[in-house]
Amino acid sequence: MNIRSFGMGAAGLLAATAVQAAEPAPAPAKHDHDHAHEASGATLRLNDGKKWQTDASLRAGMEAVRDELQPNVKAIHAKTFTAEQYAALAGRIEGRLVTIMSACKLPPDVDAQLHVLLVDFFDGAKTMKADGDRMKGVVKIVRALDAYGKHFEHPNWKSIEH
């Protein structure tokens, strides 16, 4: 997969993840299969009425995204979350997404559906870092996490509690 599909170059994405204090951002890896979903109008869907299969790497990555966001929900709702905190959280989430992308070994049909969802995650992170209503970015990520749980097989998946 090419990260330019998400509207940013490698340098921009890696710079965005540089705010991670605990972990350095991994270098994005190229998928063996490349899809462009950002402007395709692709819609997230089920696999003939069933959830898409996942692998341990994707499940761990999505749990990490959720675990980055969950502890901050109270402060976000209370409107005490600062612009700097939004930017740092967005950077950590982007770092988790880069890890998901670099470890992706899903079959092409599952991968295509994942990419539809990843666009929403990256859009949410971008909104969290921009001037304006940063909470809209959080809402987009929460909705993407909910959509993940509804469309991808992940035993014991827990959505964000809010």
What do these predicted regions represent?
Residues 57-60, 64, 88, 92-95, ...:
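Charged, amphipathic alpha-helical oligomerization/scaffolding segments
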Residues 103, 114-162:
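Helix-rich interaction surfaces within compact, conserved domain-sized segments
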Residues 22-81, 160:
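Immediate post-signal-peptide N-terminus of mature secreted/exported proteins
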Residues 96-114:
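Short, solvent-exposed, charged loop/turn and helix-capping segments
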Residues 46-61, 78-85, 106, 113, ...:
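Non-transmembrane, amphipathic alpha-helical segments
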Residues 16-19:
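N-terminal signal peptide c-region/cleavage motif recognized by signal peptidases
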Residues 1-10:
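Bacterial N-terminal signal peptides that target proteins for export
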